Amino acid sequence: MMQKFRKLSLESQLFFSFMAVSVCLLLLSLSITLSSTITRQRQEIDKNISALAAYVASMDSVVSMLENGYPDGSANEALDSLSENFPDLNVIAIYNTTGLRFYHTNRKETGETFVGGEEEAILKGSQPYITIGYGTNGSQRRAFHSIPNSDGAIIGFVIASVFN
């Protein structure tokens, strides 16, 4: 191939060299732009699901639902409305400290328990965090937030997630 290239006129060699360098620079700039755009979008998603999880954890109806020990219709209505108004959010789930699910965006999954161990840190009092986990609907980006009662004791946790 190099022999064919060398047989070309100087003008053709310069043209092909310039085009090759231009294509390489174009691909490099596109990959950098794509990478930064994906990173920015991921940060925006993380910010949104974390803020939503914090909001849900602060809802009085959610706290009273966990304190009473059974799902509450008013809390379900408020959470359903919240879920409908955030179409990019795929799952909101609320659990008590033993992992029993009190609310899930998909009603069929209410009453099940959380498995996976990702919740252990939040139940021990860590700051809210985001993980990438694998659930019944595939890979998810999940924001964990603890739910404290009026005394500050952790009585459960909320997960807000989007599918990857």
Q: What are these model-derived regions, one by one?
A:
Residues 59-113:
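Extracytoplasmic/periplasmic helical hairpin
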Residues 19, 33-63, 70, 74, ...:
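Membrane-proximal extracytoplasmic alpha-helices
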Residues 154:
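Glycine-rich acetyl-CoA-binding "A-motif" of GNAT/NAT acetyltransferases
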Residues 4-35:
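Extreme N-terminal signal-anchor transmembrane helix of membrane signaling/transducer proteins, especially
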Residues 95, 148-149:
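Core beta-strand residues in small-molecule sensory/regulatory alpha/beta domains
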Residues 72, 137-140, 151, 159-164:
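Helix-start (N-cap) segments at beta->loop->alpha junctions
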Residues 104-138:
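Extracytoplasmic/periplasmic sensor domains and loops in membrane signaling proteins
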